[in-house]
UniProtKB/Swiss-Prot annotation:
Its main location: cytoplasm. GO terms for molecular function: GTP binding; GTPase activity; translation elongation factor activity. Residues 10-285 form the tr-type G domain. GTP binds at residues 19-26, 83-87, 137-140. It is found in: Cytoplasm. The gene is fusA. This is Elongation factor G. Keywords: Cytoplasm, Elongation factor, GTP-binding, Nucleotide-binding, Protein biosynthesis. It comes from Ligilactobacillus salivarius (strain UCC118) (Lactobacillus salivarius). Catalyzes the GTP-dependent ribosomal translocation step during translation elongation. During this step, the ribosome changes from the pre-translocational (PRE) to the post-translocational (POST) state as the newly formed A-site-bound peptidyl-tRNA and P-site-bound deacylated tRNA move to the P and E sites, respectively. Catalyzes the coordinated movement of the two tRNA molecules, the mRNA and conformational changes in the ribosome.
Length: 697
C-alpha cells in the first residue's frame, strides 16, 4: 500500500447531522468544526457567513440545501460529517446521506421538540438502521424545555430516549450541563466562546434531581442489557466505564438514543456531544456489512470494511464546483483507491479514470493521494457516474444496493427570457438533473414547452435561481402544476397487434397482455407467462420496454401510468417480419386497447400537512382544510398554539402560505410532505382530461 492510513477504522466516524429546518443544525455543525480546529472564526447562519452553507442561495436564505461533506478530528477520532437540509423539499439529500452514514446526530429545538421534518428523517434513519444520538439545542431560547423535548421523542417518534445529561437552568439562566454518568457539572465561561468550562461537583440544589435521573438512566439500561440488569438486581456497584459500554451497545442496537443538551449558538454543550459521537456512535467496523451483488452470478456478497480487499464504493452525490468542475462524492465500503487509477462503474458497465481525490472541508478542498475503507471523499474525472452508481475494482465488479428516490410532485413550465438562451438552458437543466435525482426536466412534445418537476415550490425556485447564477440563464416561470399520475382500477386483458406488410420488409408483432392494478407504491411489474415460445424469448424485453415507454404517456390525459402489473400470456410471431420494434409497438397498442375497460383514473398527490396556528385561529384553519378538499386527522396543543394534522390534495395547497399568514397575522406556519396518491373526484378528472385534450370516458 502506497500510503499509511492516518486513523484506524475503529477511530473513524461517518455521521450526519439532521434536523427540522431552523433547529440550529448548521450552527451546530459550525461549532463542531470550530472546536475540532477546522475553522478560525465562527460563522453565524443569520449573518449568511456559515462555512457549511456554501451555495449563494443557501447563504441568502439561511437554509442548507446541499449536503456538504466535511472531515474533522476530535480527540483521537476522525469524524466525517455530512450536513443535511431540514426543509421537506430536500428530503432526497437526507435520504442520500443516510445511505452512506454509519450514525447520526439529531438536533432538536428545545422549545419545539420533535417537529414534522424530524419525524420524516427519523423514519428514514430507522429504515436504514442508523444509530442516533440526540442534541437538544437552543437551551438558551425563551420557552426552552429539556424534559418536554425528551417526552416528544417518546410520544411522536415512539423511540426510547436515554438522557445522559441534564441542563443547569434554561432560557437566559442556562449555564451548563450535568453529566449523569460522572455526576459532575460542566459550567461554561460566557466570554470564552465555549472553549473553556469548569468541571465541578454537582451544585447542591441539583443533587437530588440528578441522582434520581441517574438511577432512571441505569434502570433503562438494565431493561436492554443483561449484565447491567444482574448487577442492578444484586445491588452491585456499576462502574462508569460499564455504563458507557452498555450505552454504546444499546445505541448500536437501536435500543436507546442518548440525549445531550446545549446551545450551539451560545457555544455550550457541543464538545460533550462530540464525546458522545466518539463514545456511542458506530465505526465502520460496528455496522452490519453492506450487501452487494455479483452481476455475473447474481450471488449476494457482504462487504466488510477491509483495506486489503478489492475496492468497492458508492457514488452518493454529484456536485458542480465552480473551480474544479464535476465532483462525485463517494463512500468507500471496502478496499482502497489511489488518485489516477481506474475504477469500473459496475452499474453502467463503463471504466472510468479517477483524476484527483479530494476531501472536502465545507467547500475548501484538500487533495489526497489515496482513500481507505470507511472514508468519504470526492473524485474529479468521473464523467459517466451518477447518484447511486457502484464503483468497483475493474477486476471484481459488484453492484451495491442503489437508492430509491421519490417521484416529483409539482411541475412548472420554464422558458428562457431570450430565445438565444434555449440551448444554454437545456444544458443547465441537464446538469442540474444529474445532481438531483428528484428533479426532472422534459419537453412537452405537443407544445414544445420545457417542463421542470420537483418536490415542492422552494425546490423549483432554487433550481431557477441556480440556472441564473451558475449558468447565466434567466427564465420565465409558469404557474405551478400538479404532477398527476394515472392507474387502472380493474383487471383487463387486451390484444395488441401490429402488422405492416406492403412491399419490402414487413413488420409483425402480436401480444395478449393481462393488466391488473398493483398495490400503491409497488410501481410497474412485468411477468412473462409465455408458454411454448408463441412469443420468442428475444422479443420479450421489447414487450416490457414498449409497455414502459407507453405508460409514460398515460391513457387518459398524458400522465404516467403507475402501479400496474402486466402479464404477457399469449401472442404470435412471423419468422421473417417480426422484430423488436414491431413487438414494442404491439405492446403499446395492447395498453391503448386495455384502457377503456381498465377503469383508468387520474391520481393526485395527497400531502400530509401540519399547520401550527394560535388557538384563536383554529376555526379559520379548520375551514381552510375543508375548503381545500382536505380531511383533518387530528389536533393537539403544543405550547400556546394548536397543531392541526390533515391530508390535503397538493392541487389545493398552492399559495396557502399567503392565506395562512394573513389569517394568523403572520403567526401561523405549515409544513407538508407527499404522503400517497388518491383518485381525483370525477368532475375534476373530466376537467383535467378536457384541458389536456385527452380521452374522457
Amino acid at each position: 500500500m502506497a500510503n499509511k492510513r492516518e486513523f484506524p477504522l475503529e477511530k473513524t466516524r461517518n455521521i450526519g447531522i439532521v434536523a427540522h429546518i431552523d433547529a440550529g443544525k448548521t450552527t451546530t455543525t459550525e461549532r463542531i468544526l470550530y472546536y475540532t480546529g477546522k475553522i478560525h472564526k465562527i460563522g453565524e447562519t443569520h449573518d449568511g457567513a456559515s462555512q457549511m452553507d456554501w451555495m449563494e442561495q443557501e447563504q441568502e436564505r439561511g437554509i442548507t440545501i446541499t449536503s456538504a461533506a466535511t472531515t474533522a478530528q476530535w480527540k483521537e477520532n476522525r469524524i466525517n460529517i455530512i450536513d443535511t437540509p431540514g426543509h421537506v423539499d430536500f428530503t432526497v439529500e437526507v435520504e442520500r446521506s443516510l445511505r452512506v452514514l454509519d450514525g447520526a446526530v439529531v438536533v432538536l429545538d428545545a422549545q419545539s421538540g420533535v417537529e414534522p421534518q424530524t419525524e420524516n428523517v427519523w423514519r428514514q434513519a430507522t429504515t436504514y438502521g442508523v444509530p442516533r444520538i440526540v442534541f437538544v439545542n437552543k437551551m438558551d431560547k425563551i420557552g426552552a424545555n429539556f424534559d418536554y423535548s425528551v417526552s416528544t421523542i417518546k410520544d411522536r417518534l415512539q423511540a426510547n430516549p436515554l438522557p445522559v445529561q441534564m441542563p443547569i437552568g434554561a432560557e437566559d439562566s442556562f449555564e451548563g450541563v450535568i453529566d449523569l454518568i460522572e455526576m459532575k457539572a460542566d459550567l461554561y465561561d460566557e466570554d470564552e466562546l465555549g472553549s473553556k468550562w469548569d468541571t465541578v461537583d454537582v451544585p447542591d440544589e441539583y443533587k437530588e434531581d440528578a441522582q434520581a435521573r441517574r438511577d432512571e438512566m441505569i434502570e433503562a439500561l438494565a431493561d436492554v442489557n443483561e449484565d447491567i440488569m444482574d448487577k442492578y438486581l444484586e445491588g452491585e456497584e456499576i462502574s462508569n466505564d460499564e455504563i458507557r459500554a452498555a450505552i454504546r451497545q444499546a445505541t448500536l442496537n437501536l435500543d436507546v438514543f442518548p440525549v445531550f443538551a446545549g446551545s450551539a449558538f451560545k457555544n455550550k454543550g457541543v464538545q460533550m456531544m462530540l464525546d458522545g459521537v466518539n463514545d456511542y456512535l458506530p465505526s465502520p467496523l460496528d455496522v452490519k456489512p453492506y450487501k452487494a451483488t455479483d452481476p455475473e452470478t447474481g450471488e449476494e456478497i457482504e462487504l466488510k470494511a477491509d483495506d486489503s480487499a478489492p475496492f468497492a464504493g458508492l457514488a452518493f452525490k454529484i456536485a458542480t464546483d465552480p473551480f474544479v468542475g464535476r465532483l462525485t462524492f463517494f463512500r468507500v465500503y471496502r478496499g482502497t483507491l489511489e488518485a489516477g487509477s481506474y475504477v469500473l462503474n459496475a452499474t453502467k458497465g463503463k471504466r472510468e479514470r479517477v483524476g484527483r481525490l479530494l476531501q472536502m472541508h465545507s467547500n475548501h478542498r484538500n487533495e489526497i493521494p489515496e482513500v481507505f475503507s470507511g472514508d468519504i471523499a470526492a473524485a474529479i474525472g468521473l464523467k459517466n457516474t451518477t447518484t447511486g452508481d457502484s464503483l468497483t475494482d475493474p477486476k471484481t465488479p459488484l453492484i451495491l444496493e442503489s437508492m430509491e428516490f421519490p417521484d416529483p410532485v409539482i411541475q412548472v413550465s420554464v422558458e428562457p427570457k431570450s430565445k438565444a438562451d434555449q440551448d444554454k438552458m437545456d444544458v443547465a437543466l441537464q446538469k442540474l438533473a444529474e445532481e438531483d435525482p428528484t428533479f426532472k426536466a422534459e419537453t412537452n412534445p405537443e407544445t414544445g414547452e420545457t417542463l421542470i418537476a420537483g418536490m415542492g415550490e422552494l425546490h423549483l425556485d432554487i433550481i431557477v435561481d441556480r440556472m441564473k447564477r451558475e449558468f447565466n440563464v434567466e427564465a420565465t416561470v409558469g404557474e405551478p402544476q400538479v404532477a398527476y399520475r394515472e392507474t387502472f382500477t380493474k383487471q383487463v386483458s387486451a390484444q395488441g397487434k401490429f402488422v405492416r406488410q406492403s412491399g419490402g420488409k414487413g413488420q409483425y408483432g402480436d401480444v395478449w397482455i393481462e393488466f391488473t392494478p398493483n398495490e400503491e407504491g409497488k410501481g410497474f411489474e412485468f411477468e412473462d407467462a409465455i408458454v411454448g415460445g408463441v412469443v420468442p424469448r428475444e422479443y420479450i424485453p421489447s414487450v416490457e420496454q414498449g409497455l414502459k415507454e407507453a405508460m409514460q404517456n398515460g391513457v387518459l390525459a398524458g400522465y404516467p401510468l403507475i402501479d400496474v402489473k402486466a402479464k404477457l400470456y399469449d401472442g404470435s410471431y412471423h419468422d421473417v417480419d417480426s422484430s423488436e420494434a414491431a413487438f414494442k409497438v404491439a405492446a403499446s397498442l395492447a395498453l391503448r386497447n386495455a384502457a377503456p375497460k381498465g377503469g383508468a383514473v387520474i391520481l393526485e398527490p395527497i400531502m400530509k400537512v401540519e399547520i401550527i396556528a394560535p388557538e384563536d385561529n383554529l376555526g379559520d384553519v379548520m375551514g381552510h382544510v375543508t375548503a381545500r378538499r382536505g380531511r383533518v386527522e387530528g389536533m393537539e396543543a403544543r405550547g400556546n398554539a394548536q397543531v392541526v394534522n390533515a391530508f390535503v390534495p397538493l392541487a389545493e395547497m398552492f399559495g396557502y402560505a399567503t392565506v395562512l399568514r394573513s389569517a394568523t397575522q403572520g403567526r401561523g406556519t405549515f409544513t407538508m410532505t407527499m404522503d400517497h396518491y388518491e383518485p381525483v373526484p370525477k368532475s375534476i378528472q373530466d376537467e383535467i382530461i378536457k384541458k389536456n385534450g385527452g380521452n374522457a370516458e
